[in-house]
Amino acid sequence: MAGGWRGRLPHRAWLVAAVTFVALVGAAGFRAVPSVFILPLQDEFGWSRATISSAVSVNLVLYGLTAPFAAALMERFGIRRVVSVALLLVATGSGLTVFMTSTWQLIACWGVLVGLGTGSMALVFAATVAGRWFERRRGLVVGVLTAGGATGQLIFLPGLAALVDRYGWRTAALVVTVAAAAVVPLVLVGIRDYPGDVGLRPYGARPEPDGAQLAAVRPPDGAREASAAAAAGAAVSGLLGVLRDRAFWALAGGFFICGLSTNGLVGTHFVPAAHDHGLPEVTAASLLAVVGVFDIVGTVASGWLTDRFDSRHLLVMYYALRGCGLAGLPLLLSSRLHPSMIAFVVVYGLDWVATVPPTISLCRSAFGERAPVVFGWVFASHQLGAAVAAIAAGWVRGATGTYTAAWYGAAFLCLLAAFLSATVPDSRSTSTPGRRRGRRIAVDAPLPAPGT
């Protein structure tokens, strides 16, 4: 009877995926807090927006640079340990901010601690879980987890902004501390490193001879350590191997501008910019939440389009559309909502992470089996661009009293990204077998992506 009851229960992989989703959405939400802290910190401490934005930029850089090495840490120490420590770093960094009195403490807490913590829970975490626990429905799981990581911070914004508005920024920081700590028991109880740790095969896996199946679902400890060293070495050698490749620089340059024009500029400065024009902070944060909703739709649709159209043409269209939107934004900001602003939010949401599927596709065709590692560094350039925009836009606001130059500058750079995208080799020129291999690599290997 016990065996029959167990047979009716969902596979343990779905529990692992659910806990992973909660951790990813939470990590993205934790990274969203600085955008609603800018104004209250400025009011309380008298710090400039450029100074406060420097902490955000450190956070974004570390979030990106952690990605190529996060998989190695998970291989060496296990998923549960790495993610649990990452959540504790977030809780510690957020909790310590309530005692801060100087900007270096803000940079140390929200820049370094939260940046390292959330960076260890980027999409590399999702791809590792999906690759180990799923044979069937793997693509579906990766897609759902990607959406959670990419939109979690935008969905969290209205609630965090309301907390700051009603109870103060310290209360919001403490709520983040408690939330991050609360996820740790879920991770420790719900996640196992391999299906073999609980006597299971991956979801949808066919029965194999015991010895062969053991290697697939639970590699020996020595193999884990060896794979960790190989992963760390591959991350560094992968970068060195493409430094002279024009395709890499075109993709990295375009993704640098992608991060600059999303997470770094709009994600960090839209709320204070809208407040400059008289729009309440909670309302502005709610608009970013709407961006997050349409982000999900745009990402799924872009993946469908990438399978059917030239990825270069898609990127050219996405970046050009984004540039036009940013060029018009200074004319749309006002003290009240109107249809044109809502239209901007919807279109920008559809375009927010739509660049990811065609960028991954072009990485596959240009770099073959090296694509996962190369995309890790392309993603790092995305976060570097976000960091540059976070601090540069704050400096522009402090020097000119307005964000107008930042919007126009980003619009021009988006047009440059469209041009760079047109110079990358076309993924659809790759042979069919190669494309199939590329797809498998993209799913099995950890490919980080922005949480925009």
Language model features with spans:
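Helix-loop-helix hairpin linking two adjacent transmembrane segments in secondary transporters
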Residues: 145-198
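Intracellular juxtamembrane helix-capping segments at the cytosolic ends
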Residues: 41, 120-134, 354-367
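C-terminal ends and interior cores of transmembrane alpha-helices
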Residues: 88-101, 321-334
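A late C-terminal transmembrane helix in Major Facilitator Superfamily
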Residues: 144, 153, 353, 366-402, ...
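Cytoplasmic helix-loop-helix junction between adjacent transmembrane helices
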Residues: 110-147
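Extracytoplasmic gate region of multi-pass secondary transporters
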Residues: 34-38, 243-302, 389
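Hydrophobic core of transmembrane alpha-helices in multi-pass small-molecule transporters
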Residues: 25, 93, 105-121, 256-257, ...
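Helix-to-loop junctions at the C-terminal end of transmembrane segments
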Residues: 66-79, 299-311, 397-398
